[in-house]
Amino acid sequence: MAIDFLYPQYEVVRNPARCIACRACERQCSNEVHAYDDELKMMISDESRCVNCHRCVSICPTRALKIVKTDHTFKENANWSGETIMEVYRQASSGGVLLSSMGNPKPLPVYWDKILINASQVTNPSIDPLREPMETKTFLGQKPSKIERDENGKIKTNITPQLELSVPIMFSAMSYGSISYNAHESLARAAEALGIYYNTGEGGLHQDFYKYGANTIVQVASGRFGVHKDYLSAGAAIEIKMGQGAKPGIGGHLPGAKIVGDVSRTRMIPEGSDAISPAPHHDIYSIEDLRQLVFSLKEASNYKKPVIIKIAAVHNVAAIASGIARSGADIIAIDGFRGGTGAAPTRIRDNVGIPIELALAAVDQRLRDEGIRNKVSLVVGGSIRSSADVVKAIALGADACYIGTAALLALGCHLCRSCQTGKCNWGIATQRPDLVKRLNPDIGYKRLVNLVTAWEHEIKEMMGGMGINSIEALRGNRLMLRGVGLNEKELQILGIKHAGE
């Protein structure tokens, strides 16, 4: 018998005084952790299957369950942590690349938490958002350097297509296939209700969701899955995905187990086949090639839709953004290294890319220095966790923010980081009909509306406290920010002063 070096990560603690053996946990767990033992007349658990999704804990009618981290410990070693040792065991057992989902969980600096916001006191009165108007409306797209009027006072400057947002927040790209039909419906309906946008991701747009096109951003990625004329015409904007924060430099991969039924038809690939996106776009090897695709998409959409270029936050991101701003693109979306994903190689997710805070500040400053900041809007994502992160991002230079993981949390995600298995017990990252139906889009979209509405209220309160009454006045206003515990170089890149200055 071979020795199994892979110990369970979690322990299922069942209170026998509370457990009534109703078997709800058994029915609800897609990982088959729980079972009823007829001989023992009790519930038992196979803890090696547990991913800590908390479905059983939430559904238990008597609160008899809790999931705890196992106390299996190796001899303490600052270099070789228990997690690192287990990863070596896993690869020695399988011979495969380690896969993970969601964003980078490593204890690297979170710069949002080291930046503090200003508030008005005495000499500069604050504004009460309950009694005075606050403008959170945002327009994304190219802006003219000056406005010209004719002799009658009418504007004669050509204004390029713009995206109008009621609040500077959008739902980031999550493809149909990586997440469920019901999750997509929740996002689309919430975007329509809020007056913002959701992004289809690289899996095409289900025919049922074309009616939400006015609040939809359609994506064109290297695999070109589901891309056709009607698809490009359906959305309010077109996004070219050049990179993703969770896995810069590589393409996407959706396993064949998720390519079923409508997912297959929407992506226009055979059922059961793996959807593998190439690392590069095979028609883009330069800024000139990118410009050609930008204008091809503009031509295909009769120049009525803004074109977004999405890139990962990498070391030379400012120079890359400078080139994109000259390519004819209307919006640049930058995805930080903590950005979520349905599946990515663990080593790439945890070691490639840079924090979105530094990337945003560097890009905004570079475009300003070159006098081309008005040529593009900047949208940032990659772990925007709260309204405070949104305010700080806008003060650093962003026009709007993408949220993905926060939106999934609102739908019930518990960050068990097992999206790649397709067994999501919350009906989000799965295509199994019995699991998908657990996410009710009538409830899901309302929870998303509640989340963004709550953030909007908080944004207004923070802006009012600063004595600012519009997003326009906050954008790039780095004087409203101060750093804590940052070194001189970090402060220089962020373009902010240290607290106390």
Where are these regions (language model features)?
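Conserved, well-structured core domains of diverse proteins
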Residues: 1-6, 10, 33, 42, ...
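Conserved active-site-proximal phosphate/metal-binding subdomains
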Residues: 3-6, 75-81, 85-118, 342-357, ...
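Glycine-rich phosphate/ribose-binding loops and adjacent secondary-structure elements
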Residues: 8-10, 21, 26-27, 31, ...
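Structural beta-strand/beta-sheet cores of well-ordered domains, especially the beta-sheet scaffolds
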Residues: 10, 167-172, 194-196, 214-216, ...
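Catalytic cores of large soluble enzymes that bind and process phosphate-bearing ligands
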Residues: 17, 21, 48, 52, ...
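Short, well-ordered alpha-helical microsegments
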Residues: 53, 226, 317-320
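Active-site cores of enzymes that catalyze phosphoryl transfer or operate on phosphate-rich substrates
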Residues: 238-287, 292, 299, 315
